[in-house]
From Swiss-Prot:
Residues in the Extracellular compartment per record: 22-859
Recorded family membership: Belongs to the immunoglobulin superfamily. ROBO family.
Membrane topology: Single-pass type I membrane protein
Biological process per Gene Ontology, one example term: negative regulation of negative chemotaxis
Keywords associated with the record: Chemotaxis, Chromosomal rearrangement, Developmental protein, Differentiation, Disease variant, Disulfide bond, Glycoprotein, Immunoglobulin domain, Membrane, Neurogenesis, Phosphoprotein, Receptor, Repeat, Signal, Transmembrane, Transmembrane helix
Presence of the UniProt keyword Lipid metabolism in the record: no
Subcellular localization: Membrane
Record: disease: Vesicoureteral reflux 2: A disease belonging to the group of congenital anomalies of the kidney and urinary tract. It is characterized by the reflux of urine from the bladder into the ureters and sometimes into the kidneys, and is a risk factor for urinary tract infections. Primary disease results from a developmental defect of the ureterovesical junction. In combination with intrarenal reflux, the resulting inflammatory reaction may result in renal injury or scarring, also called reflux nephropathy.
UniProt-recorded name of the protein: Roundabout homolog 2
Disulfide bonding pattern of the chain: 52-110, 154-203, 246-293, 335-391, 439-488
Glycosylation sites (chain numbering): 123, 426, 752, 782, 789, 845
Organism in which the protein naturally occurs: Homo sapiens
Domain Fibronectin type-III intervals: 524-618, 637-735, 739-836
Gene giving rise to this polypeptide: ROBO2
GO cellular component, one term: extracellular exosome
Length: 1378
């Protein structure tokens, strides 16, 4: 038991120890290096420390390793000079280092260990400092000239670390802060050395070991030679003595020697004295040259030269020659001279005063320059450059000159065909070999190389043959079939050149001739020079080229001329010499030449092309002009130029006189150029006066306000004489014709600034028209009190304008000003400165509203409007007074019409049918009210006829039968005629064809309601009816003095004694045939003449007008009125038996009541009026009316059908606008009679014998309204032009219903308005013909062709509006039924 307990206790204790030990070891951690050793450099024998610190649990142990081996420390060996410090650092008491043994130098690491692991530090090197004694490079002595830089260089001894360097001068350290001294590496640099810089210099190398001094070096500073007295240029005559002095100084003393033209002086002729003076006893021309005194010492050399000039007459070394150059090219005329002194060479174009000198600064626009040697070069040749150029050489000993001609040709003239430099050579090659046929060409433009074989294009599609980049033809795998002649063709826009060679392909083993080597060929000859030119020959000379393997044995000369061929031609073969004359050339032809050399190996490359040369021309035998004589005489001509006269700002007249007139003068050349307003003087412009006796010319198209230089020169062919003296003239100025450019407006200043900056550029130079003197700036507000104007000098291009008001729109304009005035203003630049300096640049184009507002606010506009209103008011008052006064005399008279067997009886000189809208009827103008109000509850559309003129009447509106409207103006009394019992007017026995009558008035739809009557008896009779009598026949005459109650909104408007009744909404009207005018003319009438006159005058009425009613007018003083209006009413023409169908429907009716101006026609008028009255009273009793009522209360009938009176010319001119305006404000209310009945006529006017009947409909049976007019075969086709088709619906009888046309009153016709068709009523005439009505419209001035419409039309009851319809049956009896 006890043993068991002991065992248990022992086990528990063991477990406790294990558990407790595990808890303690959990706090241990492996070592970690917290401080690593660093590299160190230390001197030999000096102490040093390598630091290392580590942490860990348990505390780690530290060991050191050098180059991988453990370091022995004092712990290992107490005598060791290395000690391991408690912190772990390794301390060296001294560094041991020797040549062979280096125990301390190496790479060290420290290692920290415990039972959990180890940590290794970074490597740290320990190096031993070293500095050797010997310099790798010691400085050397330096000798420099004063002012030059000096450089001393050394390399310090080897050491570690690398030693640094500094310098000592005379054992004193040099301060390198001085600007002239700099030390870079081992170099000491002293710039701009001085004498004081001379001395002994030592280089010192140092590092942590110590210092080492180099061997000393000496810096020596010398002085270059300088001249105390220089030789000077001298000019002497031949045989004179001359001396050149030369005195110098320097350190060391320099030596002096002389040279002439960079060569030593020849002995014998020159003496040099002790003071180095050069003396020439007797000068000759060969002594001329440059003599140089040379002073030299150790540090430098100085030279001074002087020129000796020996005077002698000038001579030409190279003379200028004639040249031919294409436009746009460059030409050079050589002119080399010699002389003593050297001649001054200058050039001049013959006839020009401008001289060109060598080394002269070239003008910006000049294309000519002269080289120092005297060569004249002209670039970009122009046609105007052609002429003679003179080279002149001038010295004190004399002068010489030479002349050469420049001929300018077309561009292609100087562009020869391509040149083949090397062409293919004859070759013999074996089968399966490779052939190379060379072809190298050049030219301008670069030519294209192509090949031909036996004249055909090659290689084609053969893959064995290719053309290489340089044009060489290569053929691989040769075959026997490749044998042939191959031609190389070089082609460009200037022509083509070809070169042929033979290729012979043989079997293997045959003799093979290889291609030549270029090195075996001779070199190209030099450029051929032209030595002589005749009419048909040119002599050339050249120099041989470099010889090849074999020298050249002969030469070939090739030539080209644009006028002869387009390729190079061989003109000479096997030429043995280098001088040859080419013959057989054309006269006056330009040629180019080139030469090739020949040797047994082949041809050389061509020589450079010769200059273009023109053969001489064949002078006309009769001319025999001696050029020298011509030039001499032209040189003697003296032209005196007068002061030019300015004619206009762009024209100047030039006049001159000539002292004597020589034989050889063809004319005078006026030369002028602009000299002001340009940076450089412009070129001369020419105006030739080709008449020798001419002494004046006018220069045109000149610039305004510009100064011109003018001179005059005589000429004869290409020869030109001396210029006159130059005169200057200034054209007059004008105001600038263009505004300143690039006008910009910007704001300037601070946040709340009210200033703007305006900048601009001058107007274009061509539009300045003079010298700009100032600029004017306008800053215009919307009111004059805001305007700000400024004027600035012409040199100013911007200005600041202040004091602008915020919120005001300003327009900124700028204009330039010359002495002639202010020019065109710039476009306005709108700108608005906001309340918070918000600048708003508005668009340039103001809105129409703003523009109108600006105009309306102008005082002139307001005054003009006020004056115009006053004039209109006064005119209206005068017209109103005259009109009322005149109406009082028109209200008590009547005119009646009657028709007898012979036709309509009128006043003896007028047909009975009148046009109410024609100004020829002055007393009828106010008889008819006008309306344009639409129909209530009716279908309307945009295509309805809506143009109603004076005399139009709308029907009454249903439901308003208790109201009546005034239908007539005061003074108009209407009566009607019954034609029911009369015989037919449309009998087939009497008429076979209807013809239009030029003066028949078309009845407008609304006019039927004014007088609704049946067609009358052939015998028209008149009767003065009272209103009560007419009421029995269903007529309603308006009360002329009764006011109208109507209008818009139920408002009442007074209408006292007014001819303008109020308007009322009405329906469209039916159309009823009307009685025609007489076919036979009345005695004394001239209807035909009148019709033609109306066509010629293109008469046009103001609006649509209804026909004149058959009615009577009471008129007093008719004859006076007729005389008063005689001048305004044309006399009707004489009418023939039948009207011509060609009469246009577009012509207005010419029927009027105006009598003939002849006094004898007035009694006849009164007789006709009486007859009409009696006939009418007789026929009234025979009228029969059948009225059907639908239990409706009796309604007053509409006014009778008839003809509408014309208007006075004065009324038409003054009343129309006023009446129209009033009509638009008033509505006419008209009672609607017989509302239960409507008429639907059937019309078939293709057959004039057919009947025209009416059929009654009740209001409940009314069909859709139809067109306001019935159309027949003679109706104008204008309806189809003025109205678009509307949907139709078929009814019984096959008639078509159409939508009603709503009338609208318009102020003027538009392009959409056309003629209103109307069925022509046909009436019997003694001649068996009938007259047809015509349709007319406003704006119709010419004849219109008619179109037959073969269709019956059903008329809506609303169109007829209970009117008694008039028709005719087959027997010709007219019937009416209500």
């Amino acid at each position: 038991m006890s043993l068991l307990m002991f065992t248990q206790l022992l086990l528990c204790g063991f477990l406790y120890v294990r558990v407790d030990g595990s808890r303690l070891r959990q706090e241990d951690f492996p070592p970690r290096i917290v401080e690593h050793p660093s590299d160190v450099i230390v001197s030999k024998g000096e102490p040093t420390t390598l630091n290392c610190k580590a942490e860990g649990r348990p505390t780690p142990t530290i060991e050191w390793y050098k180059d991988g081996e453990r370091v022995e420390t004092d712990k290992d060996d107490p005598r060791s000079h290395r000690m391991l410090l408690p912190s772990g650092s390794l301390f060296f008491l001294r560094i041991v280092h020797g040549r062979r043994s280096k125990p301390d130098e190496g790479s060290y690491v420290c290692v920290a260990r415990n039972y959990l692991g180890e940590a290794v530090s970074r490597n740290a090197s320990l190096e031993v400092a070293l500095l050797r004694d010997d310099f790798r490079q010691n400085p050397t002595d330096v000798v420099v000239a004063a002012g030059e830089p000096a450089i001393l260089e050394c390399q310090p001894p080897r050491g570690h670390p690398e030693p640094t360097i500094y310098w000592k001068k005379d054992k004193v350290r040099i301060d390198d802060k001085e600007e002239r001294i700099s030390i870079r590496g081992g170099k000491l640099m002293i710039s701009n050395t001085r004498k004081s810089d001379a001395g002994m210099y030592t280089c010192v190398g140092t590092n942590m070991v110590g210092e080492r001094d180099s061997d000393p070096a000496e810096l020596t500073v010398f002085e270059r030679p300088t001249f105390l007295r220089r030789p000077i240029n001298q000019v002497v005559l031949e045989e004179e003595a001359v001396e050149f002095r030369c005195q110098v100084q320097g350190d060391p003393q320099p030596t002096v020697r002389w040279k002439k033209d960079d060569a030593d002086l020849p002995r014998g002729r020159y003496d040099i004295k002790d003071d180095y003076t050069l003396r020439i006893k007797k000068t000759m021309s060969t002594d001329e040259g440059t003599y140089m005194c040379i002073a030299e010492n150790r540090v430098g050399k100085m030279e001074a030269s002087a020129t000796l000039t020996v005077r002698a007459p000038p001579q030409f070394v190279v003379r200028p020659r004639d040249q031919i150059v294409a436009q746009g090219r460059t030409v050079t005329f050589p002119c080399e001279t010699k002389g003593n002194p050297q001649p001054a060479v200058f050039w001049q174009k013959e006839g020009s005063q401008n001289l060109l000198f060598p080394n002269q600064p070239q003008q910006p626009n000049s294309r000519c320059s002269v080289s120092p040697t005297g060569d004249l070069t002209i670039t970009n040749i122009q046609r105007s450059d052609a002429g003679y150029y003179i080279c002149q050489a001038l010295t004190v000993a004399g002068s010489i000159l030479a002349k050469a001609q420049l001929e300018v040709t077309d561009v292609l003239t100087d562009r020869p065909p391509p040149i083949i430099l090397q062409g293919p050579a004859n070759q013999t090659l074996a089968v399966d070999g490779t052939a190379l046929l060379k072809c190298k060409a050049t030219g301008d433009p670069l030519p294209v190389i192509s090949w031909l074989k036996e004249g055909f294009t090659f290689p084609g599609r053969d893959p064995r043959a290719t053309i290489q980049e340089q044009g060489t033809l290569q053929i691989k795998n040769l075959r026997i079939s490749d044998t042939g002649t191959y031609t190389c063709v070089a082609t460009s826009s200037s022509g083509e050149t070809s070169w042929s060679a033979v290729l012979d392909v043989t079997e293997s083993g045959a003799t093979i001739s290889k291609n030549y080597d270029l090195s075996d060929l001779p070199g190209p000859p030099s450029k051929p020079q032209v030595t002589d030119v005749t009419k048909n020959s040119v002599t050339l000379s050249w120099q041989p080229g470099t010889p090849g393997t074999l020298p050249a044995s002969a030469y070939i000369i090739e030539a080209f001329s644009q006028s002869v061929s387009n390729s190079w031609q061989t003109v000479a073969n096997h030429v043995k010499t280098t001088l040859y004359t080419v013959r057989g050339l054309r006269p006056n032809t330009i040629y180019l030449f080139m030469v090739r050399a020949i040797n047994p190996q082949g041809l050389s490359d061509p020589s450079p092309m010769s200059d273009p040369v023109r053969t001489q021309d064949i002078s006309p035998p009769a001319q025999g002009v001696d050029h020298r004589q011509v030039q001499k005489e032209l040189g003697d001509v003296l032209v005196r130029l007068h002061n030019p006269v300015v004619l206009t700002p762009t024209t100047v007249q030039v006049t001159w006189t000539v002292d004597r007139q020589p034989q050889f003068i063809q004319g005078y050349r006026v030369m002028y150029r602009q000299t002001s307003g340009l940076q450089a003087t412009s070129s001369w412009q020419n105006l030739d006066a080709k008449v020798p006796t001419e002494r004046s010319a006018v220069l045109v198209n000149l610039k305004k306000g510009v100064t011109y230089e003018i001179k005059v020169r005589p000429y004869f062919n290409e020869f030109q004489g001396m210029d006159s003296e130059s005169k200057t003239v200034r054209t007059t100025e004008e105001a600038p014709s263009a505004p300143p450019q690039s006008v910009t407006v910007l704001t300037v200043g601070s946040y709340n600034s009210t200033s703007i900056s305006v900048s601009w550029d001058p107007p274009p130079p061509d539009h300045q028209n003079g010298i700009i003197q100032e600029y004017k700036i306008w800053c215009l507000g919307n009111e004059t009190r805001f305007h700000i104007n400024k004027t600035v000098d012409a040199a100013i291009r911007s200005v600041i304008i202040g004091g602008l008001f915020p919120g005001i729109q300003y327009r900124v304009e700028v204009a330039a000003s010359t002495s002639a005035g202010v020019g065109v203003k710039s476009e306005p630049q709108p700108i608005i400165i906001g309340r918070r300096n918000e600048v708003v640049i508005t668009e340039n184009n103001n809105s129409i509203t703003e523009q109108i507002t600006d105009v309306v606010k102008q005082p002139a506009f307001i005054a003009g409007i006020g004056g115009a209103c006053w004039v209109i008011l006064m005119g209206f008052s005068i017209w109103l007074y005259w009109r009322r006064k005149k109406r009082k005399g028109l209200s008590n008279y009547a005119v009646t019409f009657q028709r007898g067997d012979g036709g309509l009886m009128s006043n003896g000189s007028r047909p009975g049918l009148l046009n109410a809208g024609d100004p020829s009827y002055p007393w009828l103008a106010d008889s008819w009210p006008a309306t344009s109000l639409p129909v209530n509850n009716s279908n309307s559309g945009p295509n309805e006829i809506g143009n109603f003129g004076r005399g139009d009447v709308l029907p009454p509106v249903p439901g308003q039968g208790d109201k009546t409207a005034t239908m007539l103006s005061d003074g108009a009394i209407y009566s009607s005629i019954d034609f029911t019992t009369k015989t037919s007017y449309n009998s087939s026995s009497q008429i076979t064809q209807a013809t239009p009558y030029a003066t028949t008035q078309i009845l407008h739809s609304n006019s039927i309601h004014e007088l609704a009557v049946d067609l009358p008896d052939p015998q028209w009779k008149s009767s003065i009816q009272q209103k009560t009598d007419l009421m029995g026949f269903g007529y309603s005459l308006p009360d002329q003095n009764k006011g109208n109650n109507g209008g818009k909104g139920g408002k009442k408007k007074k209408n006292k004694n007014s001819s303008k009744p109020q308007k009322n909404n009405g329906s469209t009207w039916a159309n009823v045939p009307l009685p025609p005018p007489p076919v036979q003319p009345l005695p004394g009438t001239e209807l035909e003449h009148y019709a033609v006159e109306q066509q010629e005058n293109g008469y046009d009425s103001d609006s649509w007008c209804p026909p004149l009613p058959v009615q009577t007018y009471l008129h007093q003083g008719l004859e006076d009125e007729l005389e008063e209006d005689d001048d305004r009413v044309p006399t009707p023409p004489v009418r023939g038996v039948a009207s011509s169908p060609a009469i246009s429907f577009g012509q207005q009716s010419t029927a009027t009541l105006t009598p003939s101006p002849r006094e004898e026609m007035q009694p006849m008028l009164q007789a006709h009026l009486d007859e009409l009255t009696r006939a009418y009273q007789f026929d009234i009793a025979k009228q029969t009316w059948h009225i059907q009522s639908n239990n409706q209360p009796p309604q007053p009938p509409v006014p009778p059908l008839g003809y509408v009176s014309g208007a006075l010319i004065s009324d038409l001119e003054t009343d129309v606008a006023d009446d129209d305006a009033d009509d638009e404000e008033e509505a006419l209310e008209i009672p609607r009679p017989l509302r239960a009945l409507d008429q639907t006529p059937g019309s078939s006017m293709d057959n004039l014998d057919s009947s025209v009947t009416g059929k009654a409909f009740t209001s409940s049976q009314r069909p859709r309204p139809t067109s306001p007019f019935s159309t027949d075969s003679n109706t104008s086709a204008a309806l189809s032009q003025s109205q678009r088709p509307r949907p139709t619906k078929k009814h019984k009888g096959g008639r078509m219903d159409q939508q009603p046309a709503l009338p609208h009153r318009r102020e003027g016709m538009t392009d959409e308005e056309a003629l209103v068709p109307y069925s022509k009523p046909s009436f019997p005439s003694p001649g068996g013909h009938s007259s047809s009505g015509t349709a007319s419209s406003k704006g119709s001035t010419g004849p219109r062709k008619t179109e037959v419409l073969r269709a019956g039309h059903q008329r809506n009851a609303s169109d007829l509006l209970d009117i008694g319809y008039m028709g005719s049956n087959s027997q010709g009896q007219f019937t009416g039924e209500l």
